Each structure stands twice: as C-alpha cells, then as structure tokens.
Amino acid sequence: MLPVSVKSFAKINLGLLITSKRSDGYHTLETVFAPIDWYDTLEFSPSDTLSMCCTDSALPVDENNLCMRAAKALQESAGCSTGVSITLDKRIPFGAGLGGGSSDAATVLGMLNEFWNVRASLADLHILAVRLGADVPYFLEMKGLAFAKGIGDELEDLSLRLPFHIVTVFPEVHISTVWAYKHFYPRFERTSPDLRPLVTALCLEGERSCLGAFENDFEPAVFDHYPGVKKVKQDLLDSGSFFASLSGSGSAVFGFFDKREDADDALMMMREQGFRTSITAPDFSMVR
C-alpha cells in the first residue's frame, strides 16, 4: 500500500463545566466540543516494524507518544503483528487545550484499522479510545459540534456548526491538564445549565444572550497564574470578538467574530505579538 497522508484537526471547548470529582480521582464535566481548522498531518507508510518520527523534536516518538500508544493498543486488541511507519507533522501546539495529541491518537486508530484491515467496529475502537484519553472518542467519532459529559467520553452529536469566524490563539504557554485540575477553583455546588439547548439557540437562532452560560471552569485559575493568557482574551474582545474564552485547560484562547475582516485583523495583531494562530470559517467540520 502506498503512503497515506491524513489531516488531524484540533478542537475548542464552548463551555467547560466541571461538575464533580469521582472516588477514583477523575472529574466529571459537561462541555461542547467544536472542531477548528488547525491540524497536524500524519503519514502512514508500509513497514515491517512499528516506528514513528515527528517534526517537533520536543515530542517523544516512543510509547510516551499517544500515537504510538494507539497503534500498540490496536495491535494488541486485534492480535496484529503488522508494522507501520508514522510521520507526524506537528502543527497543533501541545499543552494548549486544543486536543492535538488526542486527535492524532484517534486518527491513528481509525487509519490503522483500515491500513491493517483489522475491521474493528466503532464500538470496539471507542473502548480503546477511552483508555487512551477522555478527548480521543470525540475525534474518533464526531465531525462537528458534540455535547460531552462524564469524563468527556460520553458524546452526543448535536448536528450543528458554529456560524461564526473563529480566531484561535496560542499564547506560547504550555499548561498540563494535571496542573489545571490541581489548581482550578471548584464550584461543585452550582446547578449547571444544560448547554445543549443553548448552543442550539446560538447556532440556529443567533441567540447570544445565552453566551454567559458557556463558562470555562479552568479560566479563573489559569488567568490568575498566567496574566498573559488573560490579556490575549481581552485583546480578542477589544478587536471585535463578541465572545472569547479559554479552550479546555488552556492556554489557547479563541474568539468569535461576525466579520471576516475583523477576524483577519485580530489574527494579524496576534501574529505580530509572536503568537501562533488559526482562523476557522463558519460551518467548519472535520473532513480529512
């Protein structure tokens, strides 16, 4: 089989409400995942052994990389001994709250299921995905907006697209999920709103009065510890964004814009400050 190249897209979180802490130490949450046009590229080439290389030398290419863990998990599950050479062109920043590693792992599961002719069902792949990480099932199973609960692995396809221009900015600060969960300010006593009808009203009816409900519970602690990240959010709002928020556990921040020219201006302003950025057109979905 000839080498195959596939795009692996990032996501943002529209609202991230941490609802409880389980006895096993994991936190439950409710969030809306939305895809953005920021992607890594993975190339799969035939090989007798399982190997990986990456354009970002800061990332491991052994079993500490989710891509390799995904490949080995599928091998073991299927009893497969076939190899593959994986080349990762890394563009999505890590430690950004954009799910880049999870997206790459999901792409590996899906592609190697075909590449190796494993023919595992989506349900079987879901089990492997959950073991790899809470965000991996979203990238494996969804193309557009999805509501997530549990640890982020219980998904509901909303069949919606965000009708706005989205500017996403990485403030060059790497924040680990472990750090974020250790430092966030719990509000477990709060009654969380149901985000599903709110995002439906936002996307289909243009109802923006609901945007205040889309809080990110990591944001206050992240902003207190990293004021530069807070400034990025304010800069997006000052540039014409009608809503801006931290994505995931950060440090990436995104803003919604009505006009493409305003989004382009904000993008250029952020790039002039040395930040990596992306812009996503309205109604975007993950089509590899």
From Swiss-Prot:
Q: Which InterPro entries match?
A: GHMP_kinase_C_dom, GHMP_kinase_C_sf, GHMP_kinase_N_dom, IspE, Ribosomal_Su5_D2-typ_SF, Ribsml_uS5_D2-typ_fold_subgr
Q: Signal sequence: where? A: none
Q: Does the keyword ATP-binding apply?
A: yes
The reactions it catalyses are:
4-CDP-2-C-methyl-D-erythritol + ATP = 4-CDP-2-C-methyl-D-erythritol 2-phosphate + ADP + H(+)
Amino acids binding ATP: P93, F94, G95, A96, G97, L98, G99, G100, G101, S102, S103
| Keyword terms of this UniProt record | ATP-binding, Isoprene biosynthesis, Kinase, Nucleotide-binding, Transferase
Catalytic residues (UniProt): K11, D135
**What family does the Swiss-Prot or TrEMBL record give for this protein?**
Belongs to the GHMP kinase family. IspE subfamily.
Annotated function: Catalyzes the phosphorylation of the position 2 hydroxy group of 4-diphosphocytidyl-2C-methyl-D-erythritol.
Cite the NCBIfam families for this sequence: ispE (TIGR00154)
Task: Give the protein name, as stated in the record.
Answer: 4-diphosphocytidyl-2-C-methyl-D-erythritol kinase
Species of origin reads: Chlorobium limicola (strain DSM 245 / NBRC 103803 / 6330)
